[in-house]
Amino acid sequence: MRGAWCSIFLAIVVLPGVSMAGDFQVTSPTIKDKATISNEHVFNGFGCSGNNASPELRWERAPKGTKSFAVTVYDPDAPTGSGWWHWVIFNIPPDTTTLTAGAGKPDGGGAPAGSIQSMTDFGQPGYGGPCPPKGNKPHRYIFTVFALKVDQLPLQKDASGAMVGFYLNQNAIAKASFTGKYGR
C-alpha cells in the first residue's frame, strides 16, 4: 500500500504541467457523446444527403498557458487504412470557448477571426460531415478540441489533416473529446 501512495505522490510532483483528463471538456448541444449524429450534420455528397452543417461546440476549463485552440473531427473507422479527416481548424484565438453552428463553412465565414480551416479528406477546407460507405457498421466521429501552447501553428490552409495532427500533438497542453456515431 505504501508503494501505491509513493507512486501517486511522484505522479503529482513529476507531472504538474499536465492537465488531468477531467478538467478540460468539450460538448455540443446537438451531438451527445456516443449518440447518433443527426442529418443536420451529415455530409451532402458521396451518396449522402445531409445538410453538412458543423455543430455548435463549446469548451470549458482550458488549462493555464493556453495560447490558441484547434478543433478536429476524425473518423478512425473509415476504410482507408488511415482514417478520415472531416474537419481541421486551428489558430483559434485563446479567448474563444464556442464555435457556432455552421462555423465550418468552406468559405470560413463563420469561423473565428484569424483561424484557419485546412484541407479535409474530402479535398476541401471546412467541415465535411459523416458519410460512411453503405453497409458498414456505424462509424465513430471523434470531435476534439486541443489547447495549444503556441499562438499559431506555422501551417497554411492547404495543410493535410495528418500534417496538422502532427503539429497539434507536438504543441498540445491538453485535449478534450467526445464521439458521435453514424451509419447508413
Sequence positions of predicted segments:
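Positively charged n-region of N-terminal signal peptides that target proteins for export
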Residues: 1-5
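Bacterial N-terminal signal peptides
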Residues: 7-17
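N-terminus-centered regions that define maturation/targeting leaders and the start
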Residues: 19-184
